[in-house]
C-alpha cells in the first residue's frame, strides 16, 4: 500500500500536524513557512517510507520554517529515508529510525538556528546520518545528540556555529565519523564548540575539525576497539 500526504501551509499562526502511516511505501511532503509555535509529529512503519523526496537533495519537498517549533519523526522498518530542511530558532526535533539501511539528511538552513536542540536515535545496520547547519551564517547555543547502534554506519556533521555542543555515541563495527564545526567560538570565559563522543567497536574512523576566532574548544573522545584511525584538528 502506498500513500502520499502533502501539507502546504503558508500561515502566521499555530499549526499542528499529526500523521501515522503504516504498511510501507508511504511518502510525506511538507512545505510550511512562518510556522512559529508549530508542532509536527509523523510516524511511519514498514519499509520504503520517506519524509521528503530522497531523489532530490536540492528540493527535497520537506520544509518547515519558523521559531519555537516541535518536530517528531519516527520511522520503524527498512529502507526508510528522511530528507529536508528544519529552519528556525528555539526549536526542538526528535528523530528516531529503527531498522537497517535507513538514511537521514537534514539541513538547518543557510542562516542556521539559535538555542535549539536535535536528538537523533538510530538502531540497525548500514544506516547513514548527514546533518548540516548554517552553511553561510553564524548561530549559537545549539545541542545535537546522536546515538547509533549497529554495524556499517556513517555519520557526517557540518556546522557553522558558536557554543554548539555535539554528543555522539556509536556502537558497532566499521563506523565512519566526521564532524566539522566552524564559526566564532566563545571567549576565554565561555566555552566554544564542544564534542563528546563514545565509539565502541572495531575498525572505526574518526575525524574532528573545530575552528573559530577565539578559544577554547573542547573534545571528550572515548574510542574502544581495534584498527581505529583518529584525526583531530583544533584552531
Predicted region positions:
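Bacterial N-terminal signal peptides that target proteins for export
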Residues: 1-10
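N-terminal signal peptide c-region/cleavage motif recognized by signal peptidases
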Residues: 17-18
Amino acid at each position: 500500500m502506498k500513500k502520499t500526504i502533502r501539507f502546504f501551509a503558508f500561515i502566521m499562526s499555530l499549526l499542528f500536524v499529526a500523521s501515522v502511516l503504516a504498511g510501507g511505501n508511504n511518502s510525506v511532503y511538507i512545505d510550511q513557512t512562518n510556522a512559529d509555535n508549530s508542532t509536527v509529529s509523523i510516524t511511519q512503519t514498514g519499509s520504503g517510507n520517506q519524509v521528503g523526496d530522497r531523489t532530490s537533495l536540492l528540493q527535497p519537498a520537506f520544509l518547515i520554517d519558523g521559531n519555537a517549533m516541535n518536530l517528531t519523526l519516527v520511522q520503524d522498518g527498512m529502507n526508510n529515508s528522511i530528507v529536508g530542511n528544519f529552519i528556525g530558532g528555539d526549536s526542538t526535533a526528535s528523530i528516531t529510525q529503527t531498522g537497517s539501511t535507513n538514511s537521514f539528511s537534514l539541513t538547518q538552513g543557510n542562516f542556521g538556528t539559535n538555542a535549539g536542540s536535535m536528538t537523533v536515535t538510530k538502531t540497525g545496520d548500514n544506516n547513514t546520518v548527514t546533518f548540516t547547519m548554517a552553511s553561510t551564517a553564524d548561530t549559537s547555543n545549539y545541542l545535537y545528540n546522536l546515538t547509533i547502534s549497529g554495524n556499517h554506519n556513517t555519520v557526517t556533521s557540518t556546522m557553522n556555529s558558536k557554543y554548539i555542543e555535539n554528543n555522539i555515541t556509536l556502537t558497532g563495527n566499521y563506523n565512519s565519523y566526521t564532524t566539522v564545526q566552524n564559526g566564532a567560538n566563545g571567549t576565554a570565559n565561555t566555552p566554544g564548540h564542544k564534542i563528546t563522543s563514545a565509539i565502541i567497536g572495531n575498525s572505526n574512523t574518526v575525524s574532528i575539525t573545530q575552528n573559530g576566532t577565539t578559544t577554547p574548544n573542547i573534545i571528550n573522545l572515548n574510542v574502544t576497539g581495534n584498527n581505529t584511525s583518529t584525526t583531530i584538528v583544533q584552531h
